[in-house]
């Protein structure tokens, strides 16, 4: 009999209950007890949703991030929070976001907030984790209380529980040594704590534990490969059964290593590594389980169940009870329930599967393998009809778009002149001071903004009323920026619910869900649009709002667009053509918007490519092809303008050292980047690479409510000036200010502008 299980479930709730509960607690509007009760309620609901599985995950729920949870389980707290006392949950939030609830901070042993932990992308997804911090003298100590609490809840509910933990080698790999020490040198101190954790789970009656080691799908050198052998040899003596889980890619050169480790089962991502399944079935020792991730845990399209059974059936015959079935990875990366989508186009809806529907697909596959296809004939027939409908729908294919793609040539991505000739023309047109100040684009999304948007979508506010409300918010943003004496202004993006969804709503080839939310980090959720067909732009998308904002001021007003690579990487993308083709389609559509903004007199146009890096394949050998079409797509979008129009781009959570040449090849006049959480460490990339254009290293962390001081900003910019000529430096926050409050934004930007004025006097 085939065993079914799941690697992880979305934690936010079908209607984002966790998001709202967290934000109430942080604002002091609810108690710690209420937040913990909400967590327990969500866990109970999610285990009930997974009741048909043979094994359900436990420990996949986190109030902020599963890697941060693991840091607390291992007793690895940053030194800066160790002086705080009180409830561990408040310390947890201090590490995650710099502070906990206001009431907790008022009674803390130390005063004020602390620096939030560094946050970065989880492999090549749009989820973010809090980076573990290490020093040469880091010690570990077991605190299993969070995991044991969840395990007790699951067992009381009758759940066949499979605890999920981040593996020891991946945990070290995900972290950063703050003193440049060797992370692997900590492995001998870490392994006894993992051993004690496994013993603790055994004592609670746990039969199987899932240990996630996704770095096995990356390129590992000999030292990291040896770390796996050392780690699992040390853990082998434990009585608990270990399912080693990999996902997001192929094992390739690590396949022999993975099959040789002394564990009881191995999970592989059969969506990305389908070609490796047969080799794994051959090479895995005869007593071990092979868990096959046959359902895509990262995208929302229905699985072709009949085609999947065609290759699973011979595997099941070969492996028998040793075959387990699961999604390819945790379902954290997809929305919860398609049944909530009452307004989604019926035809498109029939092509989709969210988390609960993926579990249904899993059940159909298992039943077909265990009892024969006849037992699920109706489900298989319905699935086949949906697959056929999508494949042959005229809504998916647009001949005019395909013809435009065929006409793309190299000249389409070239500016009229090189940067050295463009820069003087832009300087003359814009007349900016040294260290010009700007923001990244968005200002706080107030309750009034959200209410107006909600009323407009519900039909209780007409278009004229909505436009008036948005114009009032835009004017407020402009007046605040003028009062702050910022140099290049933005309109604030009041009309935009999301930097990707906003554009997707106005492009043909996209569809939109009501409740298709996925977690990005903490309480931050995104609702990726659904790219189902060929992309085109029926009409201008932003020109009306930007030109209105420009009419309110004589200062330069940035046009704000999201770039094609980011729209692609932050969408649920069709899987029936190469991603590069979809990206080129987006590039042509956004290019039309860039040219319309220029015609309307907009002097500065920002094209955000926040997600450029996250699209990189996990293996460096595959980077070249991705970067080629990603950079080409940006250049097609941006480079139709005249020399005196200044093109900005923004990237966040990115490390640049290894792709700096490709970023330079994008040829944006100004690039703004996230650097404050890493203390300008990202600028190390410029030590050995002379970046030719202008750059704005982010000077304060907008993901934390803490207010940066003028002195801190000056210090960061002086560090930047050691690597970048001062005349090519801009002063700006790390990212957009959408998630902050005006009461936080005004003092932060006041200090930022004051710092820029100080720099103009101090730095030559």
Curated annotation (Swiss-Prot):
Pathway the protein acts in: Amino-acid biosynthesis; L-methionine biosynthesis via de novo pathway; L-methionine from L-homocysteine (MetE route): step 1/1
Recorded catalytic activity of this chain's protein: 5-methyltetrahydropteroyltri-L-glutamate + L-homocysteine = tetrahydropteroyltri-L-glutamate + L-methionine
Binding of Zn(2+), residues: 650, 652, 674, 735
Protein known as: 5-methyltetrahydropteroyltriglutamate--homocysteine methyltransferase
UniProt binding sites for 5-methyltetrahydropteroyltri-L-glutamate: 16-19, 121, 524-525, 570, 614
Binding-site list for L-homocysteine: 440-442, 493, 608
HAMAP family: Meth_synth
Top-rank EC class of the record's enzyme: transferase
Protein function: Catalyzes the transfer of a methyl group from 5-methyltetrahydrofolate to homocysteine resulting in methionine formation.
Binding-site positions, L-methionine: 440-442, 493, 608
Active site (record annotation): 703
InterPro entries documented for this protein: Cbl-indep_Met_Synth_N, Cobalamin-indep_Met_synthase, Met_Synth_C/arc, UROD/MetE-like_sf
Cofactor(s) listed: Zn(2+)
One BP annotation, GO: methionine biosynthetic process
Molecular function GO terms recorded: 5-methyltetrahydropteroyltriglutamate-homocysteine S-methyltransferase activity; zinc ion binding
Cofactor note: Binds 1 zinc ion per subunit.
Keywords per UniProt: Amino-acid biosynthesis, Metal-binding, Methionine biosynthesis, Methyltransferase, Repeat, Transferase, Zinc
Family, similarity comment: Belongs to the vitamin-B12 independent methionine synthase family.
Residues in the signal sequence: none
Pfam families named among the record's database cross-references: Meth_synt_1, Meth_synt_2
Organism: Burkholderia lata (strain ATCC 17760 / DSM 23089 / LMG 22485 / NCIMB 9086 / R18194 / 383)
EC numbers for this chain: 2.1.1.14
